[in-house]
Structure formats: C-alpha cells, structure tokens
Amino acid sequence: MERFAVILAAGKGTRMKSKLYKVLHPVLGKPMVEHVVDQLDQIGVSRQIVIVGHGAEAVQDTLGTRVEYAVQEEQLGTGHAVQMAEAELAGKSGATLVVCGDTPLLTAETLEALLAHHEAQQAKVTVLTAIADDATGYGRVVRGEDGNVTKVVEHKDASEAELAINEINTGTYVFDNELLFDALKQVGNNNAQGEYYLPDVISIAKEAGEVVAAHTAPTFDETIGVNDRVALSQAEAIMRKRTNERLMREGVTFMDPASTYISPDVVIGSDTVIYPGTVILGKTTIGSECVIGPNSDIRNSVIEDHAVVRQSVVTDSRIGEAAQVGPFAHLRQQAVLGANTRVGNFVEIKKSTFGDGAKASHLSYIGDASIGERVNLGCGSITVNYDGKNKFETVVEDDAFVGCNVNLIAPVKVGKGAIVAAGSTITSDVPEEALAIARERQTNKEGYTKR
C-alpha cells in the first residue's frame, strides 16, 4: 500500500507571541516541522504535502525540495487544510497519514505502528490516541465493544460518562486516501467557529459502515502539540532526556544529563565523556574516548577519537584524532585540525587547516591559512588576511616555527623548517630553513631616565 502524508503547518501560532512562524520554532536546534519530516522519511512515505499559510516562504526555505507544498490562504479549520492537498492526492489508492507540524516528539516507530494497525484492522480511518493523566480540553475517544472507535467527542460536548474517559485524540490520523477526500466534501462548518473539522470525517466513515480503528501511543508525552512557549520548553526537555538516555545506553558518559543539550541527529562514540553545560547540535559526529566540555558549544562538526574539547566553541569544523582544543578556543567556518594538534587559550581559527602535530597554544587568530605538520605558532601569532576588500591566504609549511607576537601579512608563505623571530611583521615569503627577523633593532639610551 502506498503511503502519503499531509503535514498541517498553516496555523499562525498566535499563542507563541512571536514573529517566527510557529512550526519553525526550534527544539534542540531543529525546527519542529523538520523533526516531523525526518520521522516521515524513515517510514517509506512516498509523498509529503506540507500545508502552509502564514509564513509559507519561511517554511519552504527551511524544508526546501524535501517535501511538496499546498497553500491554505484562509485558515478555515483542519478539514479545510487537508483539502488543500486534494489536487496532489485525490483519486490515488493508498493510506494518508495526517500529522501536525507542531508535534516534534512523534517517532517513526509510533507512526509505523499506527500504519501497521490501520492495515491489520482493514480500517478506513485510524486515530492515534494517548492516555492522559489530565484529559481536560482534549477530545475523548469513545470505543465500542469490539475495540474500534464509535466516535470522538470534543471536551465541551462530552457527557459526564465521556468526560471520565482518559483516552484522548492526538490529532494524528491515518485515512484511506480515496475515502478522505470524498468525505471532506461532506464536512460542513455548522459550528461555533464556522470551521471545517477533520474529525468530522470519522463520523462520516462510521455512518457509511466503515471500520474506524484506534492505536494508542506508547506515552502521552510523544503526542504533545506545541502551542506556546511553555509547551515548547516541555517538548525540548522531553526530547533532551530521550536523546541523552539513548546515548548513555550506547556507552556515552554524561556527568550531568540535565544540563547537557544534544540534538537527536548527533552521533557519539562509546566511552566519550560529556561534561555539564555542553551543547552539541546539528550534523555532528564525535568519536570514541573523547572528552567534551564543560561549557562547550559544538555544531555541525566532526571530532575524531580521543580528542579533547574544553570550554570552546566549534562550528562547521573538523578536529582530528587526539587533538586538544581549549579552554576558550573558537573554531569556525571550515577549520580543520589534524591528529595530535593543539589549539589553546583564546585562539580563533577560521577557514584554515592544521597539519598533524601543529600547535597554536595562546592568543592567536588564524584565518584563511594552511598550517603544515608540526608547526608551532607562538603566543600572539596573527594571520593578517583581510585588506578591507579581499581575503588572502597564509601558508606555513611543515616544521616551521613562528615566534610570539608575529604578524603574517597575507598573501605570504613561510617555508619548510623556517623560523620567524618573535615580534616580526612578515610581508614577504620566508625561504625554507631561513631565519626571518622583521623588527626594529633595540636601542638602549644609557642614563635616559636621570635627565
């Protein structure tokens, strides 16, 4: 059976009180709707239609060509929103999963189980339900003796007996695709809000004698919809705990899981130790037996085995095996460190490569540079790479030694095995194995202070 998905992402999200489109608010560094799309990618959905409205361009910029889009110009209810996908999906045979773009905690495993239950029950509609400790405000799921759904009743319309039910409608469904769009044509808007509600399809299917099934999510937390900043914080806390516990089960040590923020896409090898206050986001991979933190921020980077990163910021970079970074270093924009390198206190590296064994231990800026193997950059070494209009490259070849407080005015090359004396400002290439001195000779004026 072919699988389709409709993601509802057109709501304005007024309760967020934000200029940012609701489904683009991040949970552990990734927009909510992108979490949903990632899970759908894992379960073999052939087409994903995202229903957009307010802020459509921002959603399209985020998701790109991974999905298709349909625009809901007016927000006239969830049923009306799904109808916007009719041009793409009407008449096709298969199952259509309808999910909300503000449910970032839904997992591929739960969605797969929901679809499997739908097929096993030969249902036309299957509702994802959850058991709530406090069901106030949620629609209740009423089941018949056969376990199938007889109706979904909104809280305000529920009887005393129905209010006692703690199984709630999560707003996630699977529909027979052809039935879905046929039934939506019969949905009216004769209600207080004047909107077309998707759950009305359930009643239409029941009246037609079709099977309406229900599958219960493993936990209520997984089904949370984010409507305000409080729920956003709750979702992030749940996802953080879920991610950290998975990594611990895979052999990663957390000194304080509650103060460590790691996105679910991050891969970390066994016997790595994560210290408190660490943030690791994006497409980051960390090897085995590393030490990360405390208080480090790592994004979209690769860190190889046995490396140490302490109290540093690393973005879009690569750190080689057994390298040591920090404290208080900043690697960004394609900084690449080889094995056994050392980058120390208050060193910033941008768009540069360090060969194996190279060191910049203190107070340096290295930008647009190629640093060879076993090079030593002394305290205060600076690559002067920008003339106000253009960036230029600095090359320091293998085994060169650059003394303290040296300015390398790019474009410039320091040859293999060369030495640059401390305090020099280098404007011309330094030959291999040469000593370059570019500073004023010292003059002592005897008795000067007695005048």
Swiss-Prot record:
InterPro entries: Bifunctional_GlmU, GlmU-like, GlmU_C_LbH, Hexapep, Hexapep_transf_CS, NTP_transferase_dom, Nucleotide-diphossugar_trans, Trimer_LpxA-like_sf. UDP-N-acetyl-alpha-D-glucosamine binds at residues 8-11, 22, 72, 77-78, 139, 154, 169, 227, 332, 350, 365, 376. The keyword Repeat applies. It is an enzyme of class 2 (transferase). Binds 1 Mg(2+) ion per subunit. Its EC number is 2.7.7.23, 2.3.1.157. Residues 251-451 are annotated as: N-acetyltransferase. GO terms for molecular function: glucosamine-1-phosphate N-acetyltransferase activity; magnesium ion binding; UDP-N-acetylglucosamine diphosphorylase activity. Catalyzes the last two sequential reactions in the de novo biosynthetic pathway for UDP-N-acetylglucosamine (UDP-GlcNAc). The C-terminal domain catalyzes the transfer of acetyl group from acetyl coenzyme A to glucosamine-1-phosphate (GlcN-1-P) to produce N-acetylglucosamine-1-phosphate (GlcNAc-1-P), which is converted into UDP-GlcNAc by the transfer of uridine 5-monophosphate (from uridine 5-triphosphate), a reaction catalyzed by the N-terminal domain. In the N-terminal section; belongs to the N-acetylglucosamine-1-phosphate uridyltransferase family. This is Bifunctional protein GlmU. It comes from Exiguobacterium sp. (strain ATCC BAA-1283 / AT1b).
